Structures are given as C-alpha cells and as structure tokens.
C-alpha cells in the first residue's frame, strides 16, 4: 500500500499519556503489516500545555496539527486547573483545535461487541447486534447561532436568548459526510430533526432530501428528535447511520453511547473538508486513576482504527485493529471498568501487550 503519514500526537492530561502509548503502538503495528509508515510528533495540549506555556492550546501545537495528516488526542482536563478563568481551562483547547482545523463533522460509533452485551443497562435481546454511527454537526445550530446572551427587558427582568441557525451550505456539507459514511456501512441514513415545529429543521430536511438522488445506494429516512430518543432505547437495532444538528447530536450521541455499557470503549472522529481529522476517545482524562495502570486503552485504540479508515484510507488496517480488540475480549481480558465474572482483569499496559499479541497472531 505504501505511503508515509505525519501524525500529531497529543497525549494531554490524566490517563491520556498511558492510553496514547497503547494507541500509537497499535498504529505502528498496523503500519508494519500493511506496508506504510508513520512519523509521530508529540506536542502538549490542555493542562499539560498550561503548565508548560500558560495556554491550553499553544500556537506551536496548532501549527503542528495543521501540518499533519491526522491528530491523535488522548484526553484533557483535571481538578488542578478548575479554578482558572473559563477561557484558560484545558477544555478550551478542544474548541480551539476544532476551529483551527475547520472541523465540522463529529462521528461517534456506538457498537455493542458480542463479548460486552451484558455490560449494557438494557436487556441483551434489545442491544445484541447494535451498531450505530451518529454524525453530528459541530459548528452551527443552537450553540453558535446569533443573537445569543442574557439581555435586560424594558419592563424589568432579564431574558436569555439562543438562536438555532443553519445555512443550506452547512447542512449540505454535513449531509454529504453522513451519506458517504452510510454508504461505507449498511446503506441506511436516518436524518433526525424537529421539522414539525422548527423552520431550521424544515430547511435541514429539504437539503437532505435534495442530496438523496446523488446517493441512490443509501436509503434516507427522517425521524423527529423526540421519537429518535425513544427509539434508541426501544429498538436500537433499527438504526445504522444517524445525522443531526449540533445540540440534537450532542444529546443523542451520549444516549447511544450508553447502550454499550462503558464509555471506555467509545472512539470518535472529528472531520473537516480535506484537512487533518481529530481522533480521540469519548471518555475524559480520569484523573482519579491516572498513573495507576488502570485505564482502559480500547477507546483510544479504536480511535486509531477510525484514523486509519477516515484520514489515511487504510480500511484493511482499520479492520485488523478492530479485530484485535474483539480477540482480546473473546480471550476474556478486561480492564476494571468492563470487568465481568470470570474475566481476567489486566491493567492498561498488559491490555496493550495482549492487543499487540492478538494483532501479530492474526
């Protein structure tokens, strides 16, 4: 397959350093097997960057990311930085990174692996076989629309205002990402909106319907957001790929995530138009277990598989990494967060060793 790729590695805070080490090792193993190469370059972000430079996202870190083929991020944040002004906290680095890289599409898979069906809060017969991808628009909608703020009223009192706003262009570009993703999966795309009430959702639906003829191999359906929230719990297997606006996606992706039983298993990708994508686990920095070799690296490893698939167009390598994850789970290895009766509990490093062994044996 060939090719040499530059990856910006941002371990961040808490367990970030531990899980990123495992993720990088798996990427290196994939490169060896599938005949391509990586140049990894590490940079600080979040609290680690604040301690080193005074800024959560140093200019040098952002420039490295812009010059890379993809960005591989661990996690940011921790209680020692909670007293800082809001614009100086570690989490602000993520917003700056998304804006600086022009990322507008967030992809969050929620897949129930057969070995972890019992970890879900729902009955096995409800969640068995669930494999959902939520495509969330990241840069528009209620979180960013103008006007916004808290304003005085003429007769006294105050009024809070937020605006849900989308242009047809913004809807079309997220729609294309979703159609392409659905085409690579099972060919079913559910667009989630509130078109029975909101004009912005009526435009959303109109644009998605207009795109559909370009993707005749993808079945497009529509669902109101309140019904979707119910159906995710009632009959989640009906969904393949979901596309929705920012706030709806924020809520629904978290709901879909909890079908799986452990947030420690969930990867994510944030994509733009042609530049580097950002790949990170959904979970946070878990400062309470940092440095104790207790972290679950599987979400980081699966984020690496998404990096291989979406930014590097190496689908066979991505599948091989995902198979290694399934293999170690089949063998009974678990970190503490996904422990089950009869399982062999291992730490982060040992899980990484088992992953590499499974990958090399396959």
From Swiss-Prot:
The record marks 143, 194 as: Important for catalysis. Substrate binds at residues 98, 108, 136, 226. Its cofactor is Mg(2+); Mn(2+). InterPro entries: IsoCit/isopropylmalate_DH_CS, IsoPropMal-DH-like_dom, Isopropylmalate_DH. It comes from the Bacteria. Pathway: Amino-acid biosynthesis; L-leucine biosynthesis; L-leucine from 3-methyl-2-oxobutanoate: step 3/4. One of its GO terms (molecular function) is NAD binding. Transmembrane segments: none annotated. The keyword Metal-binding applies. NAD(+) binds at residues 78-91, 284-296. Keywords: Amino-acid biosynthesis, Branched-chain amino acid biosynthesis, Cytoplasm, Leucine biosynthesis, Magnesium, Manganese, Metal-binding, NAD, Oxidoreductase. This is 3-isopropylmalate dehydrogenase. It comes from Gloeobacter violaceus (strain ATCC 29082 / PCC 7421). The lineage of its organism: Bacteria, Bacillati, Cyanobacteriota, Cyanophyceae, Gloeobacterales.
């Amino acid at each position: 397959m060939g090719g040499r790729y530059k990856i910006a590695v941002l371990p961040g805070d808490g367990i970030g350093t531990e899980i990123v080490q495992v993720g990088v090792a798996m990427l290196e193993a994939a490169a060896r097997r599938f005949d391509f190469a990586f140049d990894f370059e590490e940079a600080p972000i979040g609290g680690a960057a604040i301690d080193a430079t005074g800024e959560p996202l140093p200019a040098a870190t952002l420039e490295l990311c812009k010059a890379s083929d993809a960005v591989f991020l661990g996690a940011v944040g921790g209680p020692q930085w909670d007293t800082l002004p809001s614009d100086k906290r570690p989490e602000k680095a993520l917003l700056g990174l998304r804006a600086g890289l022009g990322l507008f599409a967030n992809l969050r898979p929620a897949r129930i692996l057969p070995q972890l069906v019992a970890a879900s809060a729902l009955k096995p017969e409800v969640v068995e076989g669930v494999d959902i991808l939520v495509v969330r628009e990241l840069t528009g909608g209620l979180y960013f629309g103008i006007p916004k703020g808290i304003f005085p009223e003429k007769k006294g009192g105050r009024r809070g205002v937020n605006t849900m706003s989308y242009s047809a262009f913004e809807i079309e570009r997220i729609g294309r990402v979703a159609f392409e993703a659905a085409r690579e999966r099972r060919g079913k795309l559910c667009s989630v909106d509130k078109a029975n009430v909101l004009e912005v959702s009526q435009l959303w639906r109109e644009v998605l319907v207009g795109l559909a003829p370009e993707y005749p191999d993808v079945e497009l359906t529509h669902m109101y957001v309140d019904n979707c929230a119910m159906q995710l719990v009632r009959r989640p297997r009906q969904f393949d790929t979901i596309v929705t606006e920012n706030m709806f996606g924020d809520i629904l992706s978290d709901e879909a995530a909890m079908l799986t039983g452990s947030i420690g298993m969930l990867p994510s990708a944030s994509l733009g138009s042609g530049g580097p994508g950002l790949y990170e686990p959904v979970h946070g920095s878990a400062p309470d277990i940092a440095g104790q070799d207790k972290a679950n690296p599987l979400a980081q490893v699966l984020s690496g598989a998404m990096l291989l698939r979406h930014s590097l167009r190496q689908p066979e390598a991505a599948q091989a990494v995902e198979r290694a994850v399934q293999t170690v789970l089949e063998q009974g290895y678990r970190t503490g967060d996904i422990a089950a009766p009869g399982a062999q509990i291992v730490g982060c490093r040992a899980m990484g060793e088992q992953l590499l062994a499974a990958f090399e044996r396959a």
